[in-house]
Swiss-Prot record:
Residues that span the membrane, as ranges: 14-34, 48-68, 82-102, 141-161, 192-212, 218-238, 290-310, 316-336, 363-383
Subcellular location, principal: membrane
Protein name: Serine/threonine transporter SstT
SUPFAM superfamilies associated with the record: Proton glutamate symport protein (SSF118215)
Organism of this sequence: Shewanella pealeana (strain ATCC 700345 / ANG-SQ1)
Family to which the UniProt record says this protein belongs: Belongs to the dicarboxylate/amino acid:cation symporter (DAACS) (TC 2.A.23) family.
A single BP term in Gene Ontology: serine transport
Domain of life: Bacteria
InterPro entries: Na-dicarboxylate_symporter (IPR001991), Na:dicarbo_symporter_sf (IPR036458), Ser_Thr_transp_SstT (IPR023025)
Keywords from the named record: Amino-acid transport, Cell inner membrane, Cell membrane, Membrane, Symport, Transmembrane, Transmembrane helix, Transport
Main function: Involved in the import of serine and threonine into the cell, with the concomitant import of sodium (symport system).
Subcellular location(s) of the protein: Cell inner membrane
Topology versus the membrane: Multi-pass membrane protein
Catalytic activity: L-serine(in) + Na(+)(in) = L-serine(out) + Na(+)(out); L-threonine(in) + Na(+)(in) = L-threonine(out) + Na(+)(out)
Amino acid sequence: MNQKPSLFARLADGSLVLQILVGIIAGVILATVSKSGAESVAFLGQLFVGALKAIAPILVFILVAASIANQKKNAKTNMRPIVILYLFGTFSAAVTAVLMSFAFPTTLALTLDAAQASPPEGIGEVIHTLLFQLVDNPVNAVITGNYIGILAWGVGLGLALHHATDSTKLVFADVSHGVSQMVRFIIRLAPIGIFGLVSSTFATTGFSAIAGYMHLLLVLLGAMAIMALIINPAIVFFKIRRNPYPLVFTCLRESGVTAFFTRSSAANIPVNMALCEKLKLHEDTYSVSIPLGATINMGGAAITITILTLAAANSMGIQVDILTAILLSVVAGVSACGASGVAGGSLLLIPLACSLFGISNDVAMQVVAVGFIIGVIQDSAETGLNSSTDVIFTAAACEAAERKENA
């Protein structure tokens, strides 16, 4: 007689996406029925995001070092085409945002108090910050979640261990698998974590605060939807020469949904790593491309910077010609690649883009304040687009390389 699996075993083996959907619905219901009850379960979401953020730096460092150390000689990692896809995708997002802003011009009532923050003075400061992140103390890089530094030291250690004995390489490979197992366990807790995140978000913010900026929000979300459902699939089709939507929808469902609620590309790195493993991608490739993507693949950030900057220009009565808009796309694309190196991310890079039009820092910071008000949805959608695109482009490059080899 076969023994029936326990409830815990059934939950552990069940569909994670379905469980997350149940968590979202339960969170909305709880926030609607009892605001105090919803606020009391906020710690579940904080615990989940905290666990992901805690494991992600260690996972990236160990995986990168182990994959490079164990890499066979002359093995191809396909990193060059992936980086090109990341940069092209980010620039395409900025151009899409410009077109959306021209089609649906947005103006803002700039009467808010300027947000208290310290935006970077220019592109030079963003690059300066990134270069110093590169040479950060490796222990400090892991503690603070500085993924530029983690990648640099992980690659350095991996290259140094490339000529080590097989037993040393095996130890690193075993540690890498051990950390991956811990990540799988944390990801299985996603439904509980997302239940807490959704409950607290609806209870504390609701939609009343963002109702006044609905037009701006719709333009932002529209640009991100076009990027996710039209531009990205077109780029993927160009690479793999087949229907891109099965891959795109898989990545949006399994990476984008989690990223939407955690609102952190760094916290979503373990989720993306697990998805790449599920898609049977080359570990030597995705162990480097996913954390790199969390740093430089910032299509969502480019959209946010561009649309809010053009909204500021429209509000000030500044006429923007097409050449200036193209220049803005380049600036937004480059700035977005440095968004992970700035506290406050894409929003605090808006003053940098506003400087193109001679908009004062005081006015620009009022636009940033508007960004923080709609941030509960804008930041979630931006992170969902950024993070899911990391896997989409990595998978597309890997499949294109395989097709080329088999031709």
